[in-house]
A protein has these predicted regions:
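Preference for long, amphipathic alpha-helical scaffolds in soluble/luminal domains
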Residues: 1-262
C-alpha cells in the first residue's frame, strides 16, 4: 500500500545517503560498504604492529568476522558447483548469495594468525570452499568458477569486462597465500595449479595485472606475496623481473600509486 511504499522509500533514501561522500571540491557515491574487507585488513595491520590476540580490540574483530562466515546458503556460485559446501565471506553486510574468495582468504588468514585452534572450524570450511572455487585454468575468479564467456565483453556497455568474473592474478594470489599459510606447499594440487596460472599471467615487463585494485602495482605485490608465502625461490629470474618493475614504479616521495587509466 501507499504507506508501506513511503516507509520503504524513506528507508532507502537514508541508506543511499550513507554512500555519498563530499569534500570542498567534489562528491562521489561509493557503490557499497566494505566492512568484512576493512575489518580483516585492519586486523592484519594490528597484528603486524604487534598487538596481542588477547587484546580486546583484536579479539572482538576476529570474533565478529567468524560470526559472519556464510555456512548455510548456497549462493549464485553454486550454479557451477552445486555440491560444494559453503564457507565464504562476503565483502559487504548481509550478502549471503555473493561471497567471494578474496575476502574469504584474507579473513581466514587473519583467523589463522590470531588463533588457529579457536577458529579451526571456520578455517576448515574456508579451505574447502576456496579449493572448490578454483577454475579449470588454475586461477580463481572472485565470485564464480570458470566465468569466462568473453563474447559478452563485446557488448558496448560491458565496462572493462565487468560483466564477467574470470580468474585474475590478484585474487588467485590471495588464495595461494591462504593455502600456503595453513600449510599447503607446491605438493598440493591446488597450490601447484595456482602458481602455474600466475606464471602464465605475468606480463612481458614482469608485472601482473590486478583487477580489484589499481592495477599493475596492486597485482604485482599481491603475486609476490603469494610466491614468497609458498616458498618459491625469490631469486628466480621471473621474480627478480617483477621486483625490479615494482621498484622502478616508486614515486619521488617514496610511495607507490597508480592511476586508473593504466
Amino acid at each position: 500500500n501507499a504507506e508501506q511504499s513511503q516507509r520503504a522509500l524513506k528507508k532507502y533514501r537514508i541508506f543511499f545517503a550513507k554512500l555519498l561522500t563530499f569534500n570542498d571540491v567534489e562528491g562521489y557515491c561509493q557503490p557499497c560498504l566494505s566492512p568484512i574487507w576493512d575489518t580483516s585488513l585492519g586486523g592484519h595491520a594490528l597484528m603486524e604492529a604487534g598487538l596481542d590476540i588477547g587484546e580486546k580490540t583484536l579479539q572482538a574483530a576476529t570474533d565478529w568476522l567468524a560470526e559472519r562466515q556464510i555456512l548455510d546458503v548456497k549462493g549464485d556460485w553454486a550454479v557451477n558447483h552445486p555440491d560444494l559446501q559453503p564457507g565464504g565471506w562476503a565483502f559487504q553486510y548481509n550478502n549471503d548469495y555473493y561471497p567471494d574468495v578474496d575476502d574469504t582468504a584474507v579473513v581466514a588468514m587473519l583467523l589463522h594468525r590470531a588463533d588457529p585452534e579457536r577458529y579451526k572450524e571456520q578455517i576448515r570450511r574456508a579451505e574447502i570452499w576456496v579449493i572448490g572455487m578454483q577454475s579449470k585454468n588454475g586461477g580463481w575468479g572472485a565470485f564464480d568458477i570458470d566465468n569466462e564467456y568473453y563474447l559478452l565483453q563485446h557488448i558496448p556497455f560491458a565496462d572493462h569486462g565487468a560483466l564477467l568474473d574470470p580468474p585474475t592474478a590478484d585474487v588467485s594470489a590471495r588464495c595461494v597465500s591462504f593455502l600456503a599459510q595453513i600449510g599447503h606447499g607446491m605438493e598440493h594440487q591446488s597450490v601447484r595449479r595456482g602458481i602455474e596460472y600466475l606464471k602464465r599471467e605475468q606480463e612481458p615487463d614482469g608485472s601482473w595485472f590486478g583487477r580489484w585494485g589499481n592495477n599493475y602495482v596492486y597485482g604485482t605485490w599481491s603475486v609476490l606475496c603469494a610466491l614468497n608465502a609458498v616458498g618459491e625461490d625469490m631469486n628466480a629470474p621471473y621474480i627478480r623481473k617483477a621486483v625490479e618493475w615494482l621498484r622502478a614504479r616508486q614515486g619521488a616521495d617514496g610511495g607507490w600509486g597508480e592511476d586508473c587509466a593504466s
